[in-house]
């Protein structure tokens, strides 16, 4: 395993730990999710280039599409919760179930 791959995996696990530690606020959770998706994108790109799989080049682009969708949905939930309750706590998401 190369040094670059280990650094990317370390970044993923650090952001996973951040997700576990700062899970009370939506904004902190979204930032940790975005860093996890970024490290997964970098890992998929590095592994695709290292293994010289031409057919696997669609996987990093698919990850970017999912990351953009996740960011849009997360930010819309953040705006809705903060406009409704004035706070960005994750526990307020349970109150949105009509």
From Swiss-Prot:
Which UniProt keywords are listed? Answer: Electron transport, Membrane, Mitochondrion, Mitochondrion inner membrane, NAD, Respiratory chain, Translocase, Transmembrane, Transmembrane helix, Transport, Ubiquinone
Catalysed reactions listed for this entry = a ubiquinone + NADH + 5 H(+)(in) = a ubiquinol + NAD(+) + 4 H(+)(out)
Transmembrane regions listed in the UniProt entry: 1-21, 36-56, 58-78
Q: Does the keyword NAD apply?
A: yes
Cellular component GO terms held in the UniProt record: mitochondrial inner membrane; respiratory chain complex I
Q: Which InterPro entries match?
A: NADH_UbQ_OxRdtase_chain4L/K, NUOK/Mnh_C1-like
**Swiss-Prot/TrEMBL GO biological process terms:** ATP synthesis coupled electron transport
Write down a Pfam family by its short name. Answer: Oxidored_q2
Q: Name one GO molecular function term.
A: NADH dehydrogenase (ubiquinone) activity
Q: Where in the cell is it found?
A: Mitochondrion inner membrane
Does the entry feature the keyword Transferase, yes or no? Answer: no
What membrane topology does the annotation report for this chain?
Multi-pass membrane protein
Q: Which PANTHER family match?
A: NADH-UBIQUINONE OXIDOREDUCTASE CHAIN 4L (PTHR11434:SF0), NADH-UBIQUINONE OXIDOREDUCTASE SUBUNIT ND4L (PTHR11434)
| Assembly notes | Core subunit of respiratory chain NADH dehydrogenase (Complex I) which is composed of 45 different subunits.
| Record-stated family | Belongs to the complex I subunit 4L family.
Protein name, entry field? NADH-ubiquinone oxidoreductase chain 4L
